[in-house]
């Protein structure tokens, strides 16, 4: 899943994606600069 913009928000102490990257992993996606569970 590719994010439109980079978001480095952490959820439960774990980043939903790498810093500066636009690709989310681990069942998360970026939406409006926040991590949301897919």
Curated annotation (Swiss-Prot):
GO biological process entries: defense response to fungus; killing of cells of another organism
Any one of the GO CC terms: extracellular region
Tissue and organ expression note: Expressed by the venom gland.
GO MF term list: ion channel regulator activity; toxin activity
Annotated TM spans: none
Keywords of this entry: Antimicrobial, Disulfide bond, Fungicide, Ion channel impairing toxin, Knottin, Secreted, Toxin
Top-level taxon in the UniProt lineage: Eukaryota
Subcellular location: Secreted
Cited function: Has strong antifungal activity against C.albicans MDM8, C.krusei IOC 4559 (MIC=2.5-5 uM), C.glabrata IOC 45658 (MIC=2.5-5 uM), C.albicans IOC 45588 (MIC=2.5-5 uM), C.parapsilosis IOC 456416 (MIC=2.5-5 uM), C.tropicalis IOC 45608 (MIC=2.5-5 uM), C.guilliermondii IOC 455716 (MIC=2.5-5 uM) and A.niger (MIC=5-10 uM). Lacks antifungal activity against B.bassiana. Has no antibacterial effect against Gram-positive bacteria M.luteus, S.epidermidis, S.aureus or against Gram-negative bacteria E.coli and P.aeruginosa. Has no hemolytic activity against human erythrocytes. Probable ion channel inhibitor.
Domain notes from UniProt: The presence of a 'disulfide through disulfide knot' structurally defines this protein as a knottin.
Family stated for the protein in its record: Belongs to the neurotoxin 12 (Hwtx-2) family. 03 (juruin) subfamily.
Name of the protein described by the UniProt record: U-theraphotoxin-Aju1a
Organism name: Avicularia juruensis
């Amino acid at each position: 899943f590719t994010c439109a913009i980079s978001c480095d928000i952490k959820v439960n102490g774990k980043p939903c994606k790498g810093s500066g990257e636009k690709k989310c992993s681990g069942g998360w996606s970026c939406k409006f600069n926040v991590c949301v569970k897919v």
